[in-house]
């Protein structure tokens, strides 16, 4: 995918923190650029479930408007503390060392970014788990899919129930967007 090689300063800082923490499970730059572009369209409160060391948060921060803020939840205190150092002087980003479910009372959110496999695992109901956390017209971005051109969608030799649920849930308009030959995201807008 075509993109300028330079990264926003806040994203570079997040990569540095991730490297020092030995944390390598973060969103790709292609996904990050998409997050920044989507964040630029949102006002109010954006949220991320699964901060890691803050790379996804940094991409969101690089795009948010003046009338927006970000709440991000990371269950692992060590990772949350590392991410918090990136945003220590930024009153528009709050990093919380909590389970994502504790943010239920802080919504609804205008944009919600989360890993496709957590917390909306199909065992928990997928979109049912998220629906009340997103405002009408709000956007959910689910990361970490492998592109699939078949229907029903297949992952690791089985029907990808989570992807199928999101793509067919009538409460959302959802599209799978390929961000690289080996990576895709789902973008779901609440009706």
Say what each PLM segment does.
Residues 47, 73, 114, 137-144:
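Active-site flanking residues adjacent to catalytic metal/cofactor-binding acidic residues
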Residues 23-102:
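SAM cofactor-binding core of SAM-dependent methyltransferases
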Residues 115-119:
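Switch II (G3) loop of P-loop NTPases
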Residues 120-191:
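C-terminal substrate-binding/active-site "lid" region of AdoMet-derived donor-dependent transferases
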Residues 65, 88-90, 106, 135, ...:
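Short, well-ordered coil/turn elements that cap or connect secondary structure elements
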């Amino acid at each position: 995918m075509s993109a300028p090689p330079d990264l926003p300063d806040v994203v570079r800082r997040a990569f540095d923190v991730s490297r020092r923490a030995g944390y390598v499970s973060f969103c790709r730059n292609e996904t990050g650029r998409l997050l920044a572009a989507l964040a630029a369209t949102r006002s109010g409160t954006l949220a991320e479930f699964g901060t890691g060391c803050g790379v996804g948060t940094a991409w969101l921060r690089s795009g948010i408007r003046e009338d927006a803020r970000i709440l991000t939840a990371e269950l692992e205190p060590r990772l949350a503390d590392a991410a918090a150092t990136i945003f220590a002087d930024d009153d528009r980003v709050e990093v919380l060392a909590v389970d994502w479910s504790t943010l239920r009372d802080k919504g609804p959110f205008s944009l919600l970014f989360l890993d496709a496999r957590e917390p909306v695992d199909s065992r928990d109901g997928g979109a049912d788990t998220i629906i009340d956390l997103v405002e009408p017209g709000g956007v959910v971005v689910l990361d970490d899919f492998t592109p699939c051109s078949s229907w029903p969608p297949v992952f690791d030799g089985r029907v990808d129930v989570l992807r199928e649920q999101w793509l067919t849930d009538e409460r959302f308009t959802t599209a799978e967007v390929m961000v690289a030959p080996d990576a895709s995201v789902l973008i779901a807008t609440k009706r």
